[in-house]
A protein has these predicted regions:
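Single conserved hydrophobic/aromatic residue that forms the stacking wall/gate
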Residues: 1-11
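A residue-level signal for beta-strand positions that form part of recognition/binding surfaces
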Residues: 9, 32, 64-66
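C-terminal motif of bacterial Sec signal peptides marking the signal peptidase cleavage site
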Residues: 15-18
Length: 160
């Protein structure tokens, strides 16, 4: 690269910093969190737990935030024809979570992630099963990403 390109990168970086731009995620944004294993051992609860536990990094001190969550799944038939044949099915997954201080167990934040999606129903039962599993798995990944964003924002606001 030429020196001109390098100086424009530095100028761009300086400009973004002077405007107050800071990326949401950095090395510290998801550190200092511990997720409690859910009492409900459903497949969805365990997927959420593993997804969060793998992304969150506890601190070596006892100054961590403890996350607890509950999950609610709802399945609804939509797009029903006059002959009562269901053409689509909707899945909605809601995860409510709370953050407590590890030191004194004081609840300091509550949040919720609600994601829904639908899939087409067909005459083949196995195809419906696969479509439902794929849709549910996709929703769970989106819920995990949403909760991680909320935790990063929480952590960022704690520093202010």
């Amino acid at each position: 690269r030429s020196g001109c390109d390098w100086s424009s990168d530095v100028c761009s970086s300086d400009l973004l910093q002077s405007c107050g731009f800071q990326p949401l995620y950095n090395i510290e944004s998801l550190s200092g969190f511990i997720v409690n294993e859910p009492n409900n051992k459903s497949e969805s609860s365990l997927i959420i737990y593993k997804g969060l536990d793998g992304a969150l990094k506890p601190l070596s001190t006892s100054n961590n935030f403890i996350i607890s969550f509950t999950i609610d799944e709802q399945f609804e038939d939509i797009d029903i024809r006059e002959d009562e044949k269901v053409l689509r099915k909707n899945i909605a997954i809601s995860v409510k979570f709370s953050i407590k201080k590890e030191i004194d167990e004081e609840e300091i934040f509550t949040g919720e992630s609600l994601i829904s999606s639908a899939y087409n129903r067909v005459a083949e039962p196995y195809a419906n099963f696969v479509a439902e599993q794929d849709t549910r798995d996709r929703i769970l990944l989106l819920v995990i990403q949403d909760i991680k964003r909320q935790l990063a924002l929480f952590k960022k606001n704690q520093g202010k």
